[in-house]
């Protein structure tokens, strides 16, 4: 069987690691790149290198830092410290910021609880979250997680974990399609779900 040159096979294997990219899509992208001007490929390689060395997360909230200020922009005193929004990924922070509905602080959990795979929350992040809530005493903790099995399980865990605190715990209202992640929810729908959040 005729095989691709190693440099193409290697690129395909890396592209396949991206979410939503299977072999056929990776193959198509690889051959599309063959048509690019070498300067374009070099520019993309440089962008990937800069991405690898430049991105950083805040040690307080785990949001992506958009500047070198400390605390980060999302932890600054200019934001409303009375509300803390719990999200799964740094990308979710930007989705909520686009909706312009939330002006408080964030905390990025990272991986969610998975009853199917047995994946657990990061104990280190949970400890940091507890310290932050106990130190800052926000009035409301808003759980803004995807309407999925993992999101539901994680939301329930957080509710139970922080039930001893005198803090309002709410979750996004109906309007967030079940099983859909923030990636596929437009800013207006997200804003309505946020403004209509309920205690649970």
Swiss-Prot record:
UniProt cross-references to NCBIfam families, sorted A to Z: recR
Zinc finger map (C4-type): 58-75
The UniProt record lists the keyword Aminoacyl-tRNA synthetase: no
Keywords linked to the UniProt accession: DNA damage, DNA recombination, DNA repair, Metal-binding, Zinc, Zinc-finger
One Pfam assignment: Toprim_4
Function statement: May play a role in DNA repair. It seems to be involved in an RecBC-independent recombinational process of DNA repair. It may act with RecF and RecO.
Gene Ontology terms describing biological process: double-strand break repair; recombinational repair
Domain Toprim: 82-177
Protein name: Recombination protein RecR
Name of the gene encoding the protein in the UniProt record: recR
Entry keyword annotation includes DNA repair: yes
Family, per entry: Belongs to the RecR family.
Molecular function (Gene Ontology), one example: DNA binding
Lineage, opening ranks: Bacteria, Pseudomonadati, Chlamydiota, Chlamydiia, Chlamydiales
């Amino acid at each position: 069987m005729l095989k691709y040159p190693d440099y193409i096979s290697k690129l395909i294997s890396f592209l396949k690691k991206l979410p939503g990219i299977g072999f056929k899509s990776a193959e198509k992208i690889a051959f599309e790149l063959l048509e690019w001007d070498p300067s374009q490929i070099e520019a993309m390689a440089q962008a990937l290198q800069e991405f690898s060395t430049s991105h950083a997360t805040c040690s307080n909230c785990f949001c992506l830092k958009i500047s070198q200020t400390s605390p980060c922009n999302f932890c600054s005193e200019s934001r409303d410290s009375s509300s803390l929004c719990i999200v799964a990924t740094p990308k979710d922070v930007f989705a909520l910021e686009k909706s312009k509905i939330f002006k408080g602080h964030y905390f990025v959990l990272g991986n969610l609880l998975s009853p199917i795979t047995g994946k657990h929350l990061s104990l280190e992040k949970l400890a940091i979250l507890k310290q932050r809530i106990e130190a800052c005493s926000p009035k409301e903790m808003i759980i803004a997680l995807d309407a999925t099995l993992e999101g539901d399980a994680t939301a329930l865990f957080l509710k139970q974990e922080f039930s001893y605190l005198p803090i309002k715990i709410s979750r996004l209202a109906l309007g967030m399609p079940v099983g859909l992640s923030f990636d596929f929810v437009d800013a207006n729908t997200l804003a309505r779900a946020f403004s209509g959040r309920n205690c649970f």
